[in-house]
């Protein structure tokens, strides 16, 4: 028997949406656009289910030298300062943050370390980095950054560019503690 926490996101706009996915078996709920539309949703969900259940998902890109928060899968600039939004999310009850850098997503040249560092200086929540992994070394570099707790990648695994087992062994050999 193995425990793998399941986080579900997408079209989470109300407490009823939280109810629906949690009753279906999710352990955590990731919310982005719904929280932007209704910032009180984060606090209401944290109060009802606990902050460990609420994941603030952020799609962020640089606009005129500032970090802007995007919605609708990264297609619409909200004009909100992403770092300020993260601080509000933490104060509102989010338990962790997934930061997807639109600037590096799919580019496969490494995670957006500058953006992650800026975020980690503003919040004390666990941060999960997303967007940019292209090789095993990118994960090693990521995990040397203080304040980053996890890394998320998709395409490098889907297309067989990096094998998960090999990545875990590589990280272990390079002093990054992972479960083998």
Located regions from the model:
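Alpha-helix-loop-beta-strand connector modules within alpha/beta enzyme cores
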Residues: 1-7, 43-59, 108-135, 175-176
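C-terminal helical cap(s) of enzyme catalytic domains, especially alpha/beta-barrels
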Residues: 42-49, 141-180
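Catalytic cores of alpha/beta
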Residues: 6-7, 12-25, 114-151
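Conserved anion-binding
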Residues: 22, 26-99, 103-104
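Short secondary-structure boundary/capping elements
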Residues: 10-13, 37, 77-81, 108-111, ...
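Non-catalytic interaction surface on structured domains
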Residues: 1-5, 16, 88-89, 95, ...
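Short beta->alpha connector loops at strand-helix junctions that form conserved
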Residues: 10, 31-34, 154
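Generic structural signal for well-ordered alpha-helices
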Residues: 18, 39-43, 83-87, 113-117, ...
